[in-house]
Amino acid sequence: MSHNNVTHGKPWSGRFHEPTDTFVEEFTASIGFDHRLYRQDIHGSIAHARMLAKVGVLSREECDAIIQGLETIAQDISRGQFSWSVALEDVHMNIEAALTERIGPVGKKLHTGRSRNDQIATDIRLYLRDAIDLITAQLQRLQEGLLAIAEREAATIMPGFTHLQTAQPVTFGHHLMAWFEMLLRDTGRLADCRHRVNVLPLGAAALAGTTFPIDRAYTAELLGFDGIAENSLDAVSDRDFAIEFTAAGALLMTHLSRFAEELVLWSSAQFDFITLPDRFCTGSSIMPQKKNPDVPELVRGKTGRVNGHLVSLLTLMKGQPLAYNKDNQEDKEPLFDTVDTLLGCLRAFADMIPAITTNPDKMREAATKGYATATDLADYLVRKGVSFRDAHEIVGKAVALAIEQSKDLAALKLATLQDFSPVIEEDVFDVLTLEGSVAARNHLGGTAPAQVRAAIQRGREKLNSLA
């Protein structure tokens, strides 16, 4: 019986006696999507080669040849001059095969002390680290746009809503600053996630570490990692960092989706609070008059993609024993699409928001409807010595009468108001104006224009501290 090695063209096929089924080869290959990790893969391989040379596993000449070969491969890929092979399965094997073809047998030494298990974990962490930085930059650009509009509209009065019903007057600047605060927390979540992403798995090898005298601290330094994974099994087994990122992305997209919903409402003829620039809208194939808010609608719709990716990754991991399993090949497409979706939606919003024009007269007119100053009247009664519950009852009856007469509270005569409570005096009309209502909420977090401007200043300081 012959014991000749039957390679079948695979780097792992020494123990196999027949080639991989053609369909299985295509079914199990990931090169169709993980090729986008080539920069990170080559960056990690160069650092690994330098570390191997430092500890004496590679000679300086071998290390230089490997690095030069990898750099030329990176150039070819970036120029579209590299052919990816399904037969070589993934980005790692494609690059390694090309390296060996170009520099000879020394290319086969690169994988010493390393497995694809810790290699892909390193690639993904490098990719996510870069992605978080790009996303954060777009997010901060959007926040800067919000601050600019909020400052311009710090005193623009609009109705505040609960249950989408008029509740109390607020300023448009105050409303926009609510979105700023939500996005600021999203920025913090991404920064916090980045700390846990920025941990080096390389050196864990397949699952148990390696017998070679590797210097993981040196590799971490070369790759800019803040920490080193301290358990080899954990390093290659978990994708919690990817799940955490996707969860942060889902929250961010949820905030964008809610904001998008308001933009759609506000830009409608029924609200007419804002006008979206034509360049961010589309028309109808049949209705000539239409100007559709497609950008915010798409952002709202794309939120479901990221939410779905979060569930996919959670489900992917929930039943896996330690250590690495082929299931984890399915982590990349949800992750890549989450990054692409976040970057696209944030860019669209960051470009669109500063270009929005407001219709202050329409906002103010809407705030005059729905008895938005009713709470101010109740507060007025409390300051006159009436308990809040009694004041609530009194004002409710006054509102009912105003509805009957199709009048605003401020349009009721003083004598009519005094019929509801004798403590009401002429000064009541000061609190029933929209401007008076807004100005009265002059405390930290309130909607008074002075407080809005102070919040904007604090917001700028927070953004500057993140730069």
Curated annotation (Swiss-Prot):
It is found in: Cytoplasm. This is Argininosuccinate lyase. One of its GO terms (cellular component) is cytosol. Keywords: Amino-acid biosynthesis, Arginine biosynthesis, Cytoplasm, Lyase. The gene is argH. Signal peptide: none annotated. The keyword Lyase applies. GO terms for biological process: arginine biosynthetic process via ornithine; L-arginine biosynthetic process. It catalyses: 2-(N(omega)-L-arginino)succinate = fumarate + L-arginine. SUPFAM superfamilies: L-aspartase-like. The keyword Amino-acid biosynthesis applies. Gene3D superfamilies: Fumarase/aspartase (C-terminal domain), Fumarase/aspartase (Central domain), Fumarase/aspartase (N-terminal domain). Its EC number is 4.3.2.1. Pfam families: ASL_C2, Lyase_1. Belongs to the lyase 1 family. Argininosuccinate lyase subfamily. One of its GO terms (molecular function) is argininosuccinate lyase activity. Pathway: Amino-acid biosynthesis; L-arginine biosynthesis; L-arginine from L-ornithine and carbamoyl phosphate: step 3/3. PANTHER family: ARGININOSUCCINATE LYASE. InterPro entries: Arg_succ_lyase_C, Argininosuccinate_lyase, Fumarase/histidase_N, Fumarate_lyase_CS, Fumarate_lyase_fam, Fumarate_lyase_N, L-Aspartase-like.
